């Protein structure tokens, strides 16, 4: 990266990566970007960057990317129209602001990706996600750190975003993108990705988010399925495994960090001890990353060895998954629980539950609302008022915990169609086999969109912007041949 900056100028390397990195960090540190001021400031920033790049570079925008932008712009317009029949006009106005921010973000990321390619965009998102996750992990290991919120609730990691499942989603995105960047990367790139795996992996684990883990698996499966030179790519990406797994294993020796409602004194003491061990493991993983190919004894003529390593690794992961799950029968028995149960406060047991945590009632109400207004919906942002109308509800809910079901209920089939067009069209641009960066961007965005089907992570703008940047990189991958432009390559 440094050599590219010196040879080709900082603009071609830093600027395209800084845009998504700054957007993710700024929105996530503003409580996830969940207020009108954050949306308005972000919209102004995205529009400004878009205008400057269009004026200076005049990029060629791929047709699928244009359709993606048009889909989100149509959603913003349709949301504004729903103000006419909305039962909660003030909430609808807020949603219009959100859609304008989303549209401006997609347009900005598409324009930047069309000029500099997808690699800087992916790198910027990875940097932003790693920064946020590193801070989040420090708030757990150093609960007395100035600015740390301390231990709250059931001790699931959620700061600075404010929602644990959204933080898990951001960590998932960062892990998949880091894996893509590590493939065929220079030694210093592999080192950076291997080190980033530690805060990303710890953040994902400490959120105890089942949806984020499912999204990670789905995203990795998609990325591996479409990437070129699959065996070599898997081996290169495996440099992240030690950095992501070893610290999680270390934490098992410190129950105050993985249990609900721990004593503050225990958490302070155990967090400091865990931090020392984690830093030591990062040093070892960094050393190994610089010598990764040598450690794996790879060579150009070792095709059979590579195949057996990949198969053996996959089998080992399968066995570990079965052992960790504690048996399929036990897990299936949890489907009827109203919320996840875990004995002794051990949050690890939460990962073995299939409870919907109360989402069933929310989804049923959203479905009934859709059936009442199938074409145009009840008005954007009205679900919260609909849920609150029944005082017998056992808990409050501001969203329908499903991007697609909520869109159908509030904006009808018209809004749902626009949303699906905006989200699906970018994936049609992927040329299989795809480059590692495009495959990673596709996997990260697909994992996020899967999790958004049963959670309200879409409403956490900082994480949504990270996913939209990945989506824009995929949508722009066919423009001007910029499928995987590396730092220092001539811009389109």
Roles of regions detected by a PLM:
Residues 60-65, 92-93, 114-121:
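Interfacial helix-loop-helix linkers and transmembrane-helix boundary segments
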Residues 64, 191, 356, 394, ...:
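A generic secondary-structure micro-motif detector
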Residues 54-59:
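C-terminal ends of transmembrane helices
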Residues 155-158, 189, 360, 364, ...:
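Alpha-helical membrane and juxtamembrane elements of multi-pass inner-membrane transport
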């Amino acid at each position: 990266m440094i050599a590219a900056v010196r040879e080709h100028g900082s603009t071609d390397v830093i600027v395209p990566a800084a845009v998504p990195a700054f957007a993710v960090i700024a929105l996530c540190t503003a409580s996830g970007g969940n207020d009108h001021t954050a949306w308005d400031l972000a919209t102004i920033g995205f529009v400004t960057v878009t205008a400057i790049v269009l004026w200076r570079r005049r990029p060629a925008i791929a047709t699928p990317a244009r359709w993606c932008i048009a889909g989100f712009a149509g959603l913003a317009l349709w949301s504004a129209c729903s103000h006419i029949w909305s039962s909660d006009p003030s909430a609808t106005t807020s949603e219009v602001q959100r859609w304008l921010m989303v549209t401006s973000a997609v347009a900005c990321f598409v324009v930047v990706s069309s000029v500099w390619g997808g690699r800087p965009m992916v790198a910027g998102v990875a940097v932003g996600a790693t920064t946020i996750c590193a801070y989040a992990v420090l708030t757990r290991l150093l609960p007395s750190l100035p600015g740390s919120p301390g231990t709250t609730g059931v001790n699931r990691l959620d700061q600075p975003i404010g929602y644990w499942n959204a933080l898990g989603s951001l960590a998932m995105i960062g892990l998949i993108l880091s894996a893509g960047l590590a493939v065929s990367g220079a030694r210093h790139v592999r080192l950076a990705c291997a080190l980033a795996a530690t805060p990303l992996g710890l953040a994902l684990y400490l959120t105890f988010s089942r949806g984020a883990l499912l999204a990670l698996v789905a995203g990795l499966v998609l990325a591996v399925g479409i990437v070129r030179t699959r065996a070599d790519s898997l081996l290169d990406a495996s440099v992240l495994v030690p950095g992501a797994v070893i610290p999680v294993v270390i934490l098992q020796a410190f129950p105050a960090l993985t249990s609900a409602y721990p004593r503050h004194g225990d958490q302070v003491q155990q967090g400091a001890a865990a931090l020392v061990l984690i830093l030591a493991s990062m040093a070892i993983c960094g050393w190994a990353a610089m010598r990764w190919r040598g450690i794996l004894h790879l060579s150009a003529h070792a095709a059979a060895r590579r195949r057996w390593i990949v198969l053996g690794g996959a089998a080992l992961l399968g066995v570990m998954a079965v052992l960790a799950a504690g048996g399929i029968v036990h897990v299936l028995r949890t489907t009827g629980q109203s919320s996840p149960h875990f004995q002794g406060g051990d949050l690890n047991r939460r990962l073995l539950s299939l409870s919907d945590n109360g989402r069933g009632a929310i989804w049923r109400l959203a479905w009934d609302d859709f059936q009442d207004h199938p074409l145009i919906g009840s008005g954007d942002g009205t679900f919260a008022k609909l849920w609150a109308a029944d005082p017998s509800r056992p808990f409050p809910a501001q969203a329908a915990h499903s991007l697609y079901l909520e869109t159908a209920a509030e904006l009808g089939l018209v809004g749902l169609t626009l949303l699906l067009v905006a989200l699906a069209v970018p994936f049609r641009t992927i040329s299989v086999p795809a480059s590692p960066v495009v495959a990673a961007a596709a996997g990260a965005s697909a994992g996020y969109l899967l999790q958004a089907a049963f959670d309200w992570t879409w409403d956490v703008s900082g994480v949504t912007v990270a996913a939209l940047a990945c989506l824009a990189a995929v949508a722009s991958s066919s423009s001007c041949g910029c499928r995987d432009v590396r730092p220092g390559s001539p811009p389109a």
